[in-house]
A protein has these predicted regions:
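Extended hydrophobic-aromatic, low-complexity segments
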Residues: 150, 165-171, 180-184
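Short, contiguous acidic/charged loop-to-helix segments that flank catalytic cores in large enzymes
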Residues: 143-148, 182-188
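Transmembrane beta-strand segments of outer-membrane beta-barrel domains in Gram-negative
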Residues: 1-97, 174-181, 188-190
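C-terminal outer-membrane beta-barrel translocator/porin domains of Gram-negative envelope proteins
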Residues: 43-47, 51-164
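Short alpha-helical linear motifs
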Residues: 35, 85, 128-129, 195-197
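Short, loop-centered acidic/histidine patches that primarily coordinate divalent metals
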Residues: 162, 172-176, 197-201
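Secondary-structure boundary/capping motif
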Residues: 98-100, 167, 198-200
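C-terminal beta-signal and terminal closure region of outer-membrane beta-barrel proteins
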Residues: 186-201
């Protein structure tokens, strides 16, 4: 790890084991082959953050980029080339008044390679990053985990109102698009969603 002012950097090696054997339920179009597998992955990430607080910030920017290379023997995966993933997250707070803020965000993940293992497929759902899977992206309107194609991008806009001290109401709208081919992403499938939430800080 490296920390310098508002910048954080990390790089290293991960060892993970997934004891997948079967699914309790799969849809007719969700045909995934799973088995217990171990992985060695190399990773690097950089994070620039100027948000004034961790929860319900009033101002600032968060920009994070990460890259991971996945293998099962430090060099290859399943006897061939390893696969990798690139992720990007951006969020900023635009105060409209002392109580009302606009929070635009943009994030996505791209898988590179044609031999991706199930535990690292792109997934969205829920309100926070990494809710059930480390690579899971939030998406208002989907409360479960949804597996998507190899390239996914989400644009989100939140309107947050502070009421009566530390009470907050947030209106969220988001749009996502996904495709197996990043270079034809705009020809992919679209997702729309939204939510209205309350929170106390």
């Amino acid at each position: 790890d490296m920390n310098w002012l508002s910048f954080k950097g990390k790089a290293g090696l991960r060892c993970e084991y997934f004891n997948y054997n079967s699914f309790l339920y799969t849809g007719s179009d969700e045909l995934y082959t799973v088995k217990p597998e171990g992985f060695f992955s190399y990773f690097a990430s950089a994070h620039l953050e100027t948000l004034d607080r961790r929860y319900f910030p009033n101002r600032g920017v968060s920009l994070e980029a990460d890259y991971s290379l996945y293998t099962d023997n430090f060099v290859k995966y399943n006897g061939s080339s390893p696969f990798s993933a690139i992720g990007l997250k951006f969020m900023t707070v635009c105060p409209i008044s002392s109580r009302l803020s606009l929070l635009p965000a943009f994030y996505g993940r791209v898988l590179i390679g044609g031999n991706t293992a199930f535990p690292f497929l792109n997934a969205i759902g829920g309100e926070t990053f990494g809710r059930y899977l480390s690579q899971q992206l939030p998406f208002a309107g989907i409360n479960h985990v949804e597996i998507l194609d190899n390239s996914v991008v989400v644009a989100r806009l939140q309107l947050r109102q502070r009421i009566a001290g530390n009470n907050y109401i947030t209106l969220t709208g988001n749009y996502g698009i996904h495709n197996n081919d990043f270079f034809h992403l705009l020809e992919g499938k679209s997702l729309w969603g939204g939510s209205l939430g309350y929170a106390y800080n």
